[in-house]
Design a protein with these regions (language model features):
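Extracellular glycan-modifying ectodomains
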Residues: 1-208
Length: 208
């Protein structure tokens, strides 16, 4: 990210990476997880700005109102067409999308949830990819910025939010279903919310 620091990597009014920031994070993360996969290029994507006047949670919290609005961009993979099934589990309820970017949520005032439907206890992305590997991710909202890119290189990617995980969602998980496990947290979450011990307890139980 440092090498691309002059680009639009972070929102001005939201405490998260932009889609472009997520892409650059993926360019480093992807090759480490996936041997033999070609280095990603922006030319592999059709980029669309779906909202150009977004003011996020940081803007709402501060009395300073001179910040410029943010733009929300989606990256559609065009190198090889993909179909997606996104399944979200939360409080015993099940919701599905057939897209990585459910844009109808813009009309509901849930702008940041257009990225994989937002953060839920368990989010699973299934892709008709030629790659057969599966990935289990323990992460926070930062992971939502790069999952749309990683999803194209796996058959299944599951994101688990340890802080929303209930007993019903927990029962749907099995380490045996995945080839790799990734921990993807912002520094703030990792340092202030006792994430390692939560993850360790869950992994120990799942292995039993």
């Amino acid at each position: 990210l440092f090498n691309a620091r002059d680009q639009y990597l972070y929102y001005r009014t939201e405490d998260n990476l932009t889609s472009l920031g997520g892409f650059y994070l993926y360019t480093v993360l992807g090759p480490k997880l996936l041997e033999g996969v070609a280095r990603p290029s922006l030319s592999d994507y059709d980029i669309a700005f779906v909202k150009t006047d977004y003011y996020g949670s940081l803007y709402q919290k501060t009395p300073y109102k001179e910040a410029r609005a943010d733009s929300l961009a989606i990256f559609q993979y065009t190198k090889t067409p993909r179909q997606y099934l996104v399944t979200k589990r939360q409080d015993g309820a099940l919701k599905t999308y057939h897209t990585l970017y459910p844009l109808h949520l813009l009309d509901l005032g849930r702008e940041m949830d257009i990225f994989v439907g937002g953060l839920s206890a368990v989010t699973t992305i299934q892709t008709n990819s030629p790659y057969k590997a599966s990935l289990l991710v323990f992460g926070d909202k930062t992971a939502l910025t790069f999952l749309p890119f990683l999803a194209n290189q796996y058959s299944t990617v599951t994101l688990v939010d340890l802080f929303q995980l209930g007993s019903q969602e927990y029962e749907s998980l099995s380490l045996l279903d995945y080839d790799q496990v990734l921990f993807a947290y912002s520094i703030e979450t990792f340092m202030h919310y006792n994430t390692p011990s939560r993850a360790n307890r869950l992994l120990t139980t799942l292995e039993e």
